[in-house]
């Protein structure tokens, strides 16, 4: 198969100053994309800011022979989102792809989660995804093959402790991806997401030890060390490419694996007049996922 190239394409990558975003930006640039390295340089919990991460990655890309411009802007407000789009148009004259990657990590038990912390998590992960996509949308409509790649998480399955805010925000990204894909079916825009498996500053041993209440040593082993950020980028590259036919899908990717993340439904039970007792008496059948069906993924034509 020919290499998936992005020659002449303009791509915004948010949170591109570190971790997954940096890996995506570097990989896309190596395949010919012109990159807006968008990053507000916040701490892992969303506090502070610095232009340095975006500047350094843009220089890295240029040093490797690619084309990139930094953009010091936040995804959490409209002006920041608009600034990213303006940067792409001013520098490259077009916008073809948005990779919504920016995010933070601030694990707390629910009873310790303040409203301010909850809102900050939603602002970075969900609202940031919405604002940047909304600012870019008219230009993606005008592009030959507009693409949006969001960042979801397996945490939406409820398998990560101390993550009520994070998991809820990522769940919103999952639903937003599905809903926007339905709207986008009328044009040649594809909206999908990745659920990364990899180690960044948000998932290094000290952070994992805090989340799972285990010693750091439990997360220092060859398996975790194999989960480099670059291992997620193949899914991002495919979903961002004009040849991608998927729409409204989420791909788990990392550590050499790529697989589909989808909601399923069991066959369940059917009664003409369903009662609570019917559910109680047939709970095993209701919950049986031996022969599941992927739900909510039919994309009807407009």
Predicted regions and their residues:
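Residue(s) in the substrate-gating loop at a strand-loop-helix junction
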Residues: 153
